Regions:
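ATP-dependent adenylation/nucleotidyltransferase module used to activate substrates
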Residues: 1-165, 176, 186
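AMP-forming adenylation/ATP pyrophosphatase catalytic core
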Residues: 20, 132-367
Length: 367
C-alpha cells in the first residue's frame, strides 16, 4: 500500500547509480515536488569477481558519489545489497548463454529481473508510488487505449529504449523517466550548475561485471574452467587453423583470429559441442529472417496479425525496415534487406515511429 507524506507530496524512489544521469533525475523529481529517497543497488563486489583493479558500477566510488549527491539534495539515501540475486539471475545466465554459443545481453536481463522488479517491490513496501531512473527514454499513456507506451528518448545518441523493451504495463505505470525529454549536454549542464561531484563523470561503457571486456577470462575465473583450444574450419569443413576456445569468439568477428588465408574472413558460426569455429567471407554473415521468443508487447496487448515495423538487433544499430509475423513461441521478423550477423541471445526490439512496439530474444536466423 502506498502512502503520501503529510504535505501530500507524491513519494518517489530514485535509483542512484552514482552517475550524473540518475543524480540529475533525482534533482528534477525534487524540483517537480516529489518526496524523494535515493537508493543504490549493490549488484557486484569487484573482489569476488576478480575485478578489483577495475572501476565498475556499484563500486565504492559510485556509492560515495551517489551518497554525496543525496546529501547535497537533502534526501534520504540507502544502499541495498542484491549481490546474491545478481549472481544467480544475471551472471550465471550470462555464462550459460555464452557456453551454449549465444551472445547474451545482461543489461536487458538486469533491467528485467533485477532493477525494476526489486526497486518497485521495495518502493511499494515503503509506501512510495514511483520508481525513477536516469534512462533516456519516455513513458506516456495512450489516451485512446489507456496503455502505457515506451518511447525513445529525444536525444537519439543516448536513447535507451532498446534495453527497456521488457517492461510491463504494471511497471510502466509506476516508472518515471525525467531525462527522456533532455539531451545529455543539458543533463551535464544541470549537474555543473548544482556542483554535483559527478557532473563530468564518464558514462559506463562495458558490461558492469566485465569492465575489461575479456568475457572468456572472466568466465574462466568465475567457473574455474579452462576453455580449450580447437579448430578453425572453412565453409567446406576443412581445418584452417587453431583457435583459443570457441567461447572466445563472437559472430561477425574479424580481429584477433590470427588467420592468414589470403582474404579477410569472419566468424560465421560456432559448434560448442565440437569446439569448432567456422570462418568465411563477410557475405556469409547476412540473414533476412529472425525468430524470437520471450516476446514482450508494450504498445499492443499481443501480436495477432503482420505489422510493418522498424527493428534493431543490436543496441546502437540504426533501425531497419521489416515485417513482423506472429509465431507459436514468439514472432518471426522478415527484414526488407539482409542484416549483418543477427545473433542468437541478443534482443530484437520493434518500433513504430518513436514508440516501442515490443521485442524478444533472438533464437535463430535464416537467409
Amino acid at each position: 500500500m502506498t502512502t503520501q507524506t503529510p504535505d501530500c507530496k507524491p513519494r518517489a524512489l530514485i535509483a542512484m547509480s552514482g552517475g550524473v544521469d540518475s543524480s540529475v533525475a533525482a534533482w528534477l523529481m525534487q524540483q517537480a515536488g516529489y518526496d524523494c529517497t535515493g537508493i543504490t543497488m549493490r549488484l557486484t563486489r569487484n573482489e569476488t569477481l576478480g575485478q578489483s583493479g577495475f572501476h565498475t558500477c556499484c563500486s565504492e566510488k559510485d556509492i560515495e558519489d551517489a551518497a554525496e549527491v543525496a546529501f547535497a539534495l537533502d534526501i534520504p539515501y540507502e544502499v541495498l545489497d542484491f549481490t546474491a540475486d545478481f549472481r544467480e539471475q544475471i551472471i550465471e545466465k550470462f555464462v550459460r548463454v555464452y557456453e551454449a554459443g549465444g551472445t547474451p545481453n545482461p543489461c536487458i536481463d538486469c533491467n528485467k529481473y533485477m532493477k525494476f522488479r526489486h526497486l518497485l517491490d521495495w518502493a511499494e513496501a515503503h509506501g512510495m508510488e514511483y520508481v525513477v531512473t536516469g534512462h533516456y527514454a519516455r513513458v506516456e499513456q495512450d489516451a485512446a487505449t489507456g496503455r502505457f507506451l515506451l518511447k525513445k528518448g529525444l536525444d537519439e545518441g543516448k536513447d535507451q529504449s532498446y534495453v527497456l523493451y521488457n517492461l510491463t504495463q504494471e511497471q510502466l505505470a509506476r516508472i518515471r523517466l525525467p531525462l527522456g525529454g533532455l539531451h545529455k549536454t543539458e543533463v551535464r549542464d544541470i549537474a555543473e550548475q548544482h556542483k554535483f561531484v559527478n557532473a563530468r563523470k564518464h558514462d559506463s561503457q562495458d558490461i558492469c561485471f566485465v569492465p575489461d571486456g575479456d568475457y572468456a577470462r572472466f568466465m574462466e575465473d568465475f567457473t574455474g574452467k579452462h576453455y580449450p583450444a580447437g579448430d578453425f574450419l572453412d565453409e567446406s569443413g576443412k581445418v584452417v587453423g587453431t583457435h583459443n576456445g570457441a567461447v572466445r569468439y563472437t559472430l561477425g568477428q574479424r580481429k584477433g583470429l590470427g588467420l592468414a588465408l589470403g582474404a579477410p574472413v569472419y566468424v560465421c558460426g560456432k559448434d560448442m559441442q565440437a569446439n569448432t569455429v567456422t570462418v568465411g567471407p563477410e557475405e556469409n554473415l547476412f540473414d533476412r529472417i529472425v525468430y524470437a521468443d520471450e516476446a514482450n508487447w508494450i504498445a499492443i496487448p499481443e501480436l495477432t496479425a503482420p505489422l510493418r515495423v522498424t527493428a534493431r538487433t543490436r543496441y546502437h544499430q540504426a533501425e531497419q525496415a521489416a515485417t513482423v509475423y506472429p509465431a507459436p513461441d514468439g514472432f518471426r521478423l522478415e527484414f526488407d534487406q539482409p542484416q549483418r550477423a543477427p545473433t542468437p541471445g541478443q534482443a530484437v526490439v520493434l518500433y513504430q515511429g518513436d514508440v516501442v512496439l515490443g521485442g524478444g530474444t533472438i533464437t535463430r536466423v535464416e537467409k
